Amino acid sequence: MLSAYYNDPFLSDFCLGKIPLRLASRKSPLAVLQAHECLRRLQTFFPRLWGQVITETTQGDLDQHTPLHSVENTGFFTDDIDFLVQSGKCDLAIHSAKDLPEKPKARVIAITASIDPRDILVFQEKYLLQPFPSRLRIGCSSDRRRALISSLYPSAVITDIRGTIQTRLALLDQQKFDAIVMANAAVSRLGLRLPCTVVLPPPYHPFQGRLAITSCHHIASWEKLFLTCKITENINLLHFFS
């Protein structure tokens, strides 16, 4: 079945390693890891395929003050990455699926299975030996997480938190917060070992832990390729963005 792609007039040069597959990504360590994760999965099926990760700073990276819950379902983190594909500088863009708006600038051609949908509460080490304070200072971003934290810790002081995973953990170390909410998938992808964590109960974001791949050209070829390689877990998920 995969032999057909070696004869595909568009895909064959990628599959045979004649030209690099150019992947667009945000500049954060997590985003770059996610792009390489996608590349490795394709290389499992096409060993000669190789690629380049081309990074871009997004509006969401530059603006560290706007609360994330106020820009949900926008292209805050995705539009600038998709523009690299639209302009022909990249072939595909790799996103955290939950960053996508309902109508992204590029076509969603694949959505991966979630490596872990759960949210976790990461707290200061001192709370291993003493109870949480009644006015627990918790950093989180989305409305969904805020609602969950409010139900679990009604007296908590919930504050917006922005930045990369590393930035957020640094704020916790600096005691700006008693605890912060994170996606366990992000922690796992970065290979971090955080001993002071609590797994939070559902509901979780339906796209948490998933990657979304977008493109603007040769859509049918890309969609078929990712389905054949079983990188797209469920084709029905693509209809959410169509």
From Swiss-Prot:
Pathway noted in the entry: Porphyrin-containing compound metabolism; protoporphyrin-IX biosynthesis; coproporphyrinogen-III from 5-aminolevulinate: step 2/4
Example of a GO biological process term: protoporphyrinogen IX biosynthetic process
Purpose of the protein: Tetrapolymerization of the monopyrrole PBG into the hydroxymethylbilane pre-uroporphyrinogen in several discrete steps.
Molecular function GO terms recorded: hydroxymethylbilane synthase activity
EC number, UniProt record: 2.5.1.61
Organism classification: Bacteria, Pseudomonadati, Chlamydiota, Chlamydiia, Chlamydiales
PANTHER family: PORPHOBILINOGEN DEAMINASE (PTHR11557:SF0)
NCBIfam families from the UniProt entry: PRK01066.1 (NF002202)
Source domain of life: Bacteria
Protein name as catalogued: Probable porphobilinogen deaminase
Enzyme class: transferase
